[in-house]
Design a protein with these regions (language model features):
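Predominantly extracellular/secreted and cell-surface proteins with exposed
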Residues: 59-131
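Intrinsically disordered, low-complexity segments enriched in small/polar residues
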Residues: 15, 31, 87-88, 97, ...
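Terminal low-complexity, poorly structured segments
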Residues: 5-10, 15, 145, 151-153, ...
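Acidic, glycine-rich flexible loop segments
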Residues: 112-159
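A broad, structure-centric signal for solvent-exposed, well-ordered loop/edge residues
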Residues: 8, 61, 111, 116, ...
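Secretory targeting and sorting signals
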Residues: 1-27
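N-terminal segment immediately downstream of the Sec signal-peptide cleavage site
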Residues: 26-83, 154-191
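N-terminal compositionally biased, intrinsically disordered segments and leader/signal-like regions
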Residues: 7, 17, 73-75, 137, ...
């Protein structure tokens, strides 16, 4: 009997030790919500005059204001892993003169790393936008869900993002020195 207890204790210690040194996987969980990104004043007219347009990749969408002063990208949130919030679909930025485009597929908005990552045409991830500031963050809890809202995200192109867009679209209209857009994010998940 004593051998069995010792063997069981040894087995538990080995298993616990193996778990302690095993890499920790980030738990991804389903989520719902919306991410919107509206171009800052002057951005869409500057892009349009340079022959640059935006379009949505389903289920994402891009809508333009009545007088084409701004464009709003709307993407559904489908999952989260800690501070990274994954969306579905994406958007495409196109040079209308040459037809070349850069896709931002399944953008991930990370509220701790303060970046928006995209899967590009080449299959690589790139931090296309940086989140310079988040004006407000609110959380609401019900017995079954927890909802968090981030409002007034100041979005700017990263250096790598601006260089990628300028090179791929054969333009120089993309810059890191100006606010590109304002973002809002709502994420709901089960408790």
């Amino acid at each position: 009997m004593r051998r069995r207890v010792t063997a069981a204790l040894l087995l538990v210690c080995l298993a616990t030790g193996a778990l302690a040194i095993a890499p920790v996987a980030v738990a991804e969980e389903p989520a719902s919500g919306t991410f919107t990104m509206t171009t800052a004043p002057g951005i869409l007219p500057a892009w349009t005059s340079a022959g640059i347009s935006m379009s949505g990749i389903y289920p994402g969408s891009v809508t333009t204001s009545r007088f084409a002063n701004n464009a709003t990208v709307t993407l559904p949130v489908v999952a989260r892993a800690k501070t990274a919030n994954a969306t579905a679909g994406g958007f495409r930025i196109t040079n209308t003169d040459t037809g070349t485009s850069v896709r931002c597929l399944i953008p991930v908005i990370d509220t701790k790393a303060l970046v928006i990552d995209c899967l590009t045409n080449d299959g690589f991830n790139i931090a296309l936008f940086s989140i310079e500031e988040i004006q407000t963050r609110q959380s609401f809890t019900t017995p079954t869900t927890r909802t968090t809202l981030w409002r007034g995200m100041d979005l700017r192109l990263t250096t790598a993002g601006a260089q990628t867009l300028n090179r791929a679209l054969e333009t120089n209209v993309f810059s890191t020195s100006v606010r590109t857009a304002e973002g809002n994010l709502s994420v709901a998940r089960d408790r």
